[in-house]
Amino acid sequence: LFGTLDEHNRFAGPETMAPPWNAPAEGATPTMDGFVADYISFFTWEKGRQPTYDEYAQIMQCYTPEQVPVLNGLAREFGVFDHWFCEVPSQTFMNRSFWTAATCTPLPTGGTANSPVSHWIKDNTAETLFNRLESLGKTWKVYVKDGQIPLTGVIHWPRLRDRFATHFVPFEEFEDDAAAGTLPDFSLIEPNLLLGHGDYHPAAGAALAPGVDLQVDPPSSILSGEMFLERLFTAYRNMRSPEGANVWNTTLFIGWDEPGGTYDHVPPGPVPAPDAAAPAGQFDFRFDRSGYRVPAIVVSPWVEPGSVYNQEHRHTSMLATLRDKWGLGEPFTQRDAAAKPFDYVFSRQTPTDPDAWDVPAALPAPPYHVEWESSDKSLSTLGKAALPGVIAAAKAKGLPLPPEVEDPNFHLTTELFYDIQVLVGAHFWPKMGPQGADMVARLEDLKKALHDATKPEA
């Protein structure tokens, strides 16, 4: 954002970077001119060579409306925010925590990076939207697509652990609840984040060894995000129950956690730290700088078609809006206290007709997003990062996983890694995976597979 790259951090990786961590000068305004330099530096560290022009030019590119017809169609048919910023110039876990808690500062590291995941599981004690809703008699669920480990549960583990068995369910249950008019007051929907990507996230990352070009992520395509969004929108559009939740009294909000490092020209404005008294976090970050823009679309028959909202918003605008609408009490932190609600978007006096909404269908996706066997059941880098901490928590709670699972010298194939994810996820989130006799059988199959993998060749 600031074009700042300390000479001693040029070509350095996350583990070797040193103070002052490429930090800008106090009070500096983002110049939005450091994307290529940062990409070249990280690429060189990761792959052991300088990128070519065609390689580093990718960070300045974007997708055309024709390549993402569902996303583009929703933006044109409903309302789009063109000044919606993520909360932290960092990774997934931090920004997702701000969506639902307006902070991540209780962590010992200040919550500046995804890892170590164990800190999130043990120490993120911040009050969440879900806790506040429940205390005031409101209902909620987290619906998860194609995965047994909900990131919302991992991020807010200490606060939500007692609700894992009841409030975290497969996405198919959302479709059923939407059709029946039985959606809760607040639904959070997680796309597929662990098995490849179903979240508009292209494949990313390479093996972290110089000169090795193996992908860490399984094959991925933004078209899988298009497929999922079309399915989600279809379920929303068809909500016609005469009682309970329906399309006329329910809003679909589409947002992202962070932009991933690709180019943008609009600098983020200043933000207050969630807790000004909190100590600096990892990399000496004080949470007083915002991340940059992400897409945000609001879908409702009460939204004027083709609207573009120019007011500045961030993820905590969701909390500010819900606090106002439902009387949820005091702000969670100084960040959502300063956030602007977006209730002004519901400006129509009469609703539009859902049957007349014009949103194109998704383009065909590659086979590895239709049938996971095509990618050998590979987990994404995010899935691989989250799993060790969840495994440790499962072992501590008595799940009898084979010892090889925690042996750093034992090579887990992608299929074994996937099977472990299924079992560990089902242990904590029983609605997300096998239970009872099926769980026992899957554990025995895993033990046998691990035993076979360690047998010496004849």
Where are the regions that the model predicts?
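N-terminal pro-sequences and low-complexity stem/linker regions of secreted or lumenal proteins
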Residues: L1-A458
